[in-house]
Amino acid sequence: ICPQATAEIPRNVGHPLASARRLIELLGHQYPDHTLHVVGDAAYASQALRGLPDNITWTTRLRKNAALYRLAPARTGRRGRPRTKGNRLPQLAKLAVSMPWAAAEVTRYGTTTAVELAHRQCLWYTPFGPQVVQLVMVRELSHTGYDVALVSTDLRATAPEIVERYASRCRPLDTPVPR
């Protein structure tokens, strides 16, 4: 990253995620014709992510206690402020039981494995506000419930692409490093 771009970012101001967002927005501004895919763990999700530019997507692991909501209903035609979110969805464990699962092959950490995926669009209002996100739940073929829940602002990506993108964020400690 060029020193001139990083010099514009104030240090020790606010949450580290807010600083990271400003840096990513600078990159997005420098490359407006490219889509930047940012991936992080559950700690990298806060209100600092509201209103991301169109050319920046954010993929993160979902917290087990995350409050997910249906999409905002259509305007009723009555006076007053329209609703910004729909009804609350059940907890992730209950949601996993009611969602349809499909088998898929994904490449994670250097190996291709068969897993089951379930996905839907919803709102994770706490970090992303009214921005629609894609929820992807992953489980091994022999498991019930879910193993990992991911959320992404990239609505064009398929569920396997989101899983592979999240798995590419780092190498697990027990994976040998290529020489």
Residue ranges of model-derived segments:
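Short, charged/polar micro-motifs that form catalytic or ligand-binding hotspots
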Residues: P10, V39, A43, R165
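An anionic, glycine-rich sequence signature occurring as long contiguous blocks
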Residues: I1-I9, T59-P172
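Short, surface-exposed basic-aromatic patches at helix termini and helix-loop junctions that form
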Residues: L49-R61
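Short, glycine/acidic-rich beta->alpha junctions
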Residues: S19, G40-Y44, L52
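RNase H-like nuclease fold core
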Residues: I1-D33, T76
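Short, well-ordered alpha-helical microsegments
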Residues: A45-L49, A159
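Short, well-ordered loop/turn elements at secondary-structure boundaries
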Residues: P32-H34, L52-N55, H143-Y146
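Short, conserved catalytic/metal-binding motifs centered on acidic residues
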Residues: L36-Y44, W58, L150, C170-R179
